[in-house]
């Protein structure tokens, strides 16, 4: 079916320029690249762009820690990111940076238009300020005790223990992450974007039917709770663009970051000497299509602030947002300690790009669902699908064509009706690629791969080859098998670019979507070479181990007690809440006959007596001074039968052992039986 060529601009979210690309990032870039490659195969004009998000306090501070300029750091990071994306065959037309002349000019233009149109408001706000560093502190650069659950060492915007959200001014005993100083409140004039003015427009955009249902529903919740003005300014020192006519004030990173999409495209147009396409794609009444592939964590910025900024500055809005979920590994959040926080470059040292591209694609849909990279399932699926079903189809037929017929295919198909079954599926598979129902496309392709392999099993060319006078049948059967392989690889070309290139070299023919309607007949193919190798679990094990070693190599060296006794794996707040710690009075302390390690402690919990055996004798050779002391015990530990009697709990102590054991005691005023929280 002939399609009208469309003009399409596609972006991925801009990776932040202070860290390496990992497998979580790669989900989005692979998803977008598969979609883009399909659109290009169908003859559409696609511009696929990205850039590094290169501004903000974290980049400024990390560069200071490294002893280099922010410009040097983001330059090195950009090269690393581009190398990683190229290694995964992400086919960007341009990869730029938000720290660019194009982005500065466009940010200033959009801000000026918003200001002229009355959408920028000024007001004075109070913020936490680091008096030692001389800087205002973003929420994530303040830590203190959670005002809700009282957990220490929590960020200024939310508690990672109980999940509560709050403002940094609500923290108990806040400290600057930058200097350790106690921050003070200080006033500053800030600039705000009047987002509520665009509420009606945004609601109409939400109801247009273009957005994913889950995105539209979430936006409706935000509308119902009321849109707020958005602070788009930050005070010096700050790494970014200074706001015009506002010395010492800088654009907040989230203002110029999405403008980076425009900046990267402008840079691409300038490189091409193209003076018309930028306006053609970004003008208010543009008929070009604009799609942003993003993660679900940044929907708020892309569905509210970004279209409102564009509307208020007389530019076009996105055609749609394509939102995906997070990546887990082996059913859990990526973990550095378990070796499942895997960098893109580390993956490529152990596996090819096609393998991960295939696995992610097979699991993706148009919904905002999390994707689990189960490493054992990954090995099984790649071997079962790519090797056993697709590549094996070629290897089972190619040898006969090469050896018996000098590489020349038959002049006719053995089963034209079966071939038509394959080509007829192009429409539904194409629709699945187009609508981002990638898993559905893969399932349909693999079902047809099964059909193709059954055909070869039934025709048994290895048997026919031994039968006199059946050369024509053998050539026709193998020609049929290789043509079905060609069709399958054409459909998989957006997913497996490296394998597709090897298949094209073998078939001596480009894999083109429309070309499959005409089978390869009386056509000479090249000698068959192995197209893809099986993968093994030992490669996964090596990958995980390498990831662990990378973490060790980059981690700051641990000294002191933590080096000898590392912190245990993280537990949940619910797990911790199960432990009942109580203040206890030591009524009696005595030696245990037959043991040179234990003391027998009689503890008073405020009306309840407990008998506890504790291995602290080496540090307290005379137990008498312990009598009358307060300590802390685990009160709900199951009783443990010992040969000296039953131990009904555990007292808390610190230290490595031997003489260095220190019984914990609460401050004066604590009472026996009180819970330790």
From Swiss-Prot:
Gene3D superfamilies from the UniProt entry: HUPs, Isoleucyl-tRNA Synthetase, Domain 1, Methionyl-tRNA synthetase, Zn-domain, Nucleic acid-binding proteins
Keyword Cell inner membrane: no
GO molecular function terms noted in the UniProt entry: ATP binding; metal ion binding; methionine-tRNA ligase activity; tRNA binding
Domain of life: Bacteria
Localization of this protein: Cytoplasm
Main location: cytoplasm
Any single biological process term in GO: methionyl-tRNA aminoacylation
EC number(s) per entry: 6.1.1.10
Residues binding Zn(2+): 146, 149, 159, 162
UniProt family annotation: Belongs to the class-I aminoacyl-tRNA synthetase family. MetG type 1 subfamily.
Stated name of the protein: Methionine--tRNA ligase
Gene name as annotated: metG
């Amino acid at each position: 079916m002939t399609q009208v060529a469309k003009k399409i601009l596609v972006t991925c979210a801009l990776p932040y320029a202070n860290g390496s690309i990992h497998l979580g990032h790669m989900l989005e870039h692979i998803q977008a690249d598969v979609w883009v490659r399909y659109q290009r195969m169908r003859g559409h004009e696609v511009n696929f762009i990205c850039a590094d998000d290169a501004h903000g306090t974290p980049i400024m501070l990390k560069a200071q820690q490294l002893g280099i300029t922010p410009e040097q750091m983001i330059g090195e990071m950009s090269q690393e990111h581009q190398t990683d994306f190229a290694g995964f065959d992400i086919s960007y037309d341009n990869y730029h940076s938000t720290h660019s002349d194009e982005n500065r000019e466009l940010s200033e233009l959009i801000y000026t238009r918003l200001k002229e149109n009355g959408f920028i408001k000024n007001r004075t706000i109070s913020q936490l300020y680091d008096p030692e560093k001389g800087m205002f502190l973003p929420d994530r650069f303040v830590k203190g005790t959670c005002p809700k659950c009282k957990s220490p060492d929590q960020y200024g915007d939310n508690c990672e223990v109980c999940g509560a959200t709050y403002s940094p001014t609500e923290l108990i005993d806040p400290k600057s992450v930058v200097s350790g100083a106690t921050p003070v409140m200080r006033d500053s004039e800030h600039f705000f974007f009047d987002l509520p003015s665009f509420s009606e427009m945004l609601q109409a955009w939400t109801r247009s039917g273009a957005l994913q249902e889950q995105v539209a529903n979430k936006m409706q919740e935000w509308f119902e709770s009321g849109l707020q003005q958005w602070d788009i300014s930050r005070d010096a020192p700050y790494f970014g663009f200074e706001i015009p006519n506002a010395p010492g004030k800088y654009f907040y990173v989230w203002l110029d970051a999405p403008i980076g999409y425009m900046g990267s495209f402008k840079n691409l147009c300038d490189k091409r000497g193209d003076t018309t396409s930028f306006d053609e794609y970004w003008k208010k009444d543009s008929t070009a299509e604009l799609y942003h592939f993003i993660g679900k964590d940044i929907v708020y910025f892309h569905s509210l602030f970004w279209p409102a900024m564009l509307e208020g500055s007389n530019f076009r809005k996105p055609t749609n947002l394509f939102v995906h979920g997070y990546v887990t590994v082996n059913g859990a959040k990526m973990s550095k300690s378990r070796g499942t926080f895997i960098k893109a470059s580390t993956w490529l040292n152990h596996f090819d790009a096609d393998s991960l591209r295939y696995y992610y694609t097979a699991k993706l849909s148009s919904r905002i669902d999390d994707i689990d990279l189960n490493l054992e399932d990954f090995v099984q699926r790649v071997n079962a699908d790519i090797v056993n079903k697709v590549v094996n189809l070629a290897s089972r037929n190619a040898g006969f064509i090469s050896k018996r017929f000098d590489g020349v295919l038959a002049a006719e198909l053995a089963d034209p009706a079966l071939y038509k079954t394959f080509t007829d599926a192009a429409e539904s598979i194409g629709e699945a690629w187009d609508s981002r129902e990638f898993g559905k496309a893969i399932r349909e392709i693999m079902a047809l791969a099964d059909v193709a392999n059954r055909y070869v099993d039934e025709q048994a060319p290895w048997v026919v080859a031994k039968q006199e006078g059946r050369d024509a049948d053998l050539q026709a059967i193998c020609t049929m098998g290789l043509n079905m392989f060609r069709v399958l690889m054409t459909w998989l070309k957006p997913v497996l670019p490296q394998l597709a290139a090897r298949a094209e070299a073998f078939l001596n023919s480009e894999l083109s979507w429309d070309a499959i309607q005409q089978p390869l007949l009386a056509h000479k193919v090249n000698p068959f070479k192995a197209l893809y190798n099986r993968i093994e679990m030992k490669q996964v094990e090596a990958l995980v181990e390498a990831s662990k070693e990378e973490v060790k190599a980059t981690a700051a060296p641990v000294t002191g007690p933590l080096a000898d006794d590392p912190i245990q794996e993280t537990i949940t707040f619910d797990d911790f809440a199960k432990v009942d710690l109580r203040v206890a009075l030591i009524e009696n302390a005595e030696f245990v006959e037959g043991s040179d390690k234990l003391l027998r402690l009689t503890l008073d919990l405020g009306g309840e007596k407990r008998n506890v055996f504790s291995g602290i004798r080496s540090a307290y050779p005379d137990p008498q001074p312990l009598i009358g002391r307060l300590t802390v015990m685990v009160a709900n530990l199951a009783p443990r039968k010992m040969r000296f009697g039953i131990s009904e709990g555990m007292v808390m102590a610190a230290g490595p052992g031997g003489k260095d054991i220190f019984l914990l005691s609460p401050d004066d005023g604590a009472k026996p039986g009180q819970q330790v929280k």
